[in-house]
UniProtKB/Swiss-Prot annotation:
Keyword Cell wall biogenesis/degradation: no
Residues where ATP binds: G38, P39, S40, G41, S42, G43, K44, S45
Protein name: Macrolide export ATP-binding/permease protein MacB
UniProt-recorded Gene Ontology molecular function terms: ATP binding; ATP hydrolysis activity; transmembrane transporter activity
Family assignment from sequence similarity: Belongs to the ABC transporter superfamily. Macrolide exporter (TC 3.A.1.122) family.
Function: Non-canonical ABC transporter that contains transmembrane domains (TMD), which form a pore in the inner membrane, and an ATP-binding domain (NBD), which is responsible for energy generation. Confers resistance against macrolides.
Organism: Bdellovibrio bacteriovorus (strain ATCC 15356 / DSM 50701 / NCIMB 9529 / HD100)
Assembly and oligomerization: Homodimer.
EC number of this enzyme: 7.6.2.-
Topological category with respect to the lipid bilayer: Multi-pass membrane protein
Length: 650
């Protein structure tokens, strides 16, 4: 079963080479009970670690069950430890956050079985601890903890059990109980190898090997070796590998348990991710809301709309800054419509602030004088009532179409149609309510009143000019030509000097404005999201720091897991899963906080915010990616720890 030849083990202590084992050769048959004794420094524990595949010899040959150990990879050694070897340690090495049955089942998570309550219960009953199945290690005596360790060593039906000073920390009663359990296991055909310094225990073995100064001093057969057993130990089947998905689910479950055991540290680790994700979701919601508001506001304008405004140029004077400032008149508007081909319709506009009163209610809002064509050009067909006509415009009729905000502030739930209001102390009859447009950032598009443009000019504002002219072009392809014709016609009508013709009138293409605003909004959204993403990266660095600390604190646990059969990838996935759990939990909480922040901003400030599914998925995915990226190094560091070095770590 075990055949070692010329085994040597040396350690380099600075410039000094220390030989611990000096050419040991021995064979151990199946079903034997071997005690290895020797004083401190004799090499007995080192020999057991090599036999148990926790350490590798510097020189020599080790054949285990017909396989040369030196030819096995690290993962193959882990599989042999898991399937064929059980360990009982002097320090018990139970995980304090787990119940007894979970500690017993721990090796199963690295096989296809996973945690098994029934198997653990049967083994705990076998070692006399069935009533302690839900107790944690700090609730048990030393003897009880060692019996749990024995049950753990049996969970995978091992061929060999290695016990390193199994009674070293126990009272005499517990010592006898543990030795009796080991004898019963040996009677069942399991090979037992015990390292001890107690002569009484050594004398109870079937074979006693004494070491001194790294060599075998004596090898004595105390009891005859029984015939080779024909038990289930000889009928082992290769266990199939676990499905990757199931394996990852178990690692994630372990990750949740670990984090639950360190709530404060886990919470602080999540905080950076939480803030970062909340900021990303909130900023993207603000940006998306602003963009959609702009799109909604401009979509009604159409891509064939031009807006003409007068510049700051003065004409007719003999000195700079003298003369009359250029204004756009109603005659200009009529001429534009009649003389420039390609124009479908025009709507002059004159606007200003107005104090509105209705009974005992007051409201200050924007008052716009527009032409009847405005209704079609700006998608402003009233949802209640009607728009004013061209006849009412020419007759300067005192009628008004109000926005939904004005209607709500002045009339509440009452219908405003037919009611009389005062605009700057002038009586107007409400004939319609405009469709709801929503907010464009801090500006409320529904907080306005439309009146006939001629009425506004002469009855409200006392002007003989308009502020701007909306011009709808029939075909988008004609827009450049119409723009040039507008500039030429207006410069000619107002006798603008050649040197000032570029500044006298401004013609805005709403399609270009819409594109520019959308581009600006997208850029702003990305800028805000990028700034927020920085906090995510900072949170990721925090996770990496915490995980590195965790690896250091749990070095002995890592050694234990490797001793009971965890491969390098198992340790890697476990710590990676823990960092993913931290980042994903932080991400989910951050998404909730970000959504709440967006709703709060929308309610308190009245800004439009939109939390899109894309932003939520992006934030969630990015938080998981942060966990993977920043958890990789600590996980890799943990996976590369050598089993025996990790177990010895203090």
């Amino acid at each position: 079963m075990i055949d070692i030849k010329g085994i040597r083990k040396s350690y380099q202590m600075g410039d000094t080479k220390v030989d611990v084992l000096k050419g040991i050769s021995l064979k151990i048959e199946r079903g034997d009970f071997v005690a290895i004794m020797g004083p401190s420094g004799s090499g007995k524990s080192t020999l057991m670690h090599i036999l148990g595949l926790l350490d590798v010899p510097s020189e020599g040959s080790y054949n285990l069950n017909g396989r040369e150990v030196a030819d096995l990879s690290e993962d193959e050694l882990a599989i042999v430890r898991r399937e064929e070897i059980g360990f009982i340690f002097q320090q018990f090495n139970l995980l304090p956050r787990m119940e007894a049955w979970q500690n017993v089942s721990l090796p199963l998570i690295y096989s296809e079985d996973g945690f098994s309550y029934d198997k653990a219960q049967a083994l705990l009953d076998k070692v006399g601890l069935a009533e302690r199945i839900h107790h944690k290690s700090n609730e048990l005596s030393g003897g009880q903890q060692q019996r749990i360790a024995i049950a753990r060593s049996l969970i995978n039906n091992p061929r060999i059990i290695f016990a390193d000073e199994p009674t070293g920390n126990l009272d005499s009663k517990s010592e006898k109980e543990i030795i009796q359990i080991l004898h019963k296991l040996n009677d069942q055909g399991i090979t037992v190898i015990v390292v001890t310094h107690e002569e009484e225990i050594g004398q109870q073995a079937k074979r006693l090997i004494r070491l001194r100064d790294g060599v075998i001093q004596s090898d004595e057969r105390l009891q005859a070796l029984p015939a080779a057993p024909t038990t289930a130990q000889e009928k082992r089947q290769e266990k199939t590998a676990k499905w990757p998905v199931r394996e990852m689910i178990e690692h994630l479950h372990q990750g949740f348990q670990t984090l639950a055991a360190n709530k404060v540290r886990s919470g602080l680790s999540m905080l950076g991710i939480l803030i970062g994700v909340a900021a990303v979701v909130g900023m993207l919601a603000l940006g998306t809301g602003a963009r959609q508001s702009i799109e909604k506001q401009l979509s009604s304008l159409g891509s064939n709309l031009l807006v003409l405004r007068a510049g700051n140029v003065r004409v007719g004077g003999v000195m700079q800054e003298s003369g009359v400032r250029i204004r756009i008149s109603l005659d200009d508007v009529s001429t534009i419509k009649n003389q420039i081909s390609g124009i479908k319709d025009v709507s002059p506009s004159s606007s200003g602030r107005g104090q509105i009163t209705y009974l005992n209610k007051n409201w200050n809002t924007q008052v716009m004088g527009v032409a009847p064509a405005y209704e079609q050009m700006r998608a402003s067909t009233p949802i209640f009532g009607r728009f004013f006509s061209e006849e009412e415009n020419q007759r300067r009729t005192l009628v008004a179409v109000i926005g939904t905000t004005v209607a709500r502030e002045l009339f509440g739930e009452k219908s405003p149609i037919g009611e009389m209001i005062k605009i700057n102390k002038v009586n107007f009859r409400v004939i319609g309510v405009l469709p709801e447009k929503g907010a464009a950032g801090p500006q409320d598009q529904d907080d306005r009143i439309l009146v006939p443009v001629v009425t506004a000019m002469y009855r409200l504002f006392g002007r003989n000019y308009v502020d701007s002219v909306d011009i709808e072009v029939r075909d988008a392809a004609d827009i450049p030509e119409v723009q040039d014709s507008l500039q030429e016609l207006m410069n000619k009508r107002h006798r603008v000097p050649v040197s000032s013709q570029g500044d006298a009138f401004n013609v805005f293409n709403m399609a270009d404005i819409q594109q520019a605003l959308n581009s600006t909004s997208q850029t702003l959204s990305m800028l805000l999201a990028s700034i927020a993403a920085i906090s995510l990266v900072v949170g990721g660095i925090g996770i990496m720091n915490i995980m590195l600390v965790s690896v250091t604190e749990r070095t002995k646990e890592i050694g234990l897991r490797k001793a009971i059969g965890a491969r390098r990838r198992d340790i890697l996935l476990q710590f990676l899963a823990e960092s993913i759990v931290v980042s994903v939990c932080g991400g989910l909480l951050g998404i909730a906080l970000g959504v709440g922040f967006s709703l709060l901003i929308s309610k308190v400030l009245g800004w439009s915010t939109v939390v899109s599914a894309g932003s939520v998925i992006l934030s969630f995915g990015f938080s998981a990616l942060i966990g993977i990226v920043f958890g990789s190094y600590p996980a890799s560091k943990a996976s590369k720890l050598h089993p025996i070095e990790a177990l010895r770590y203090e």
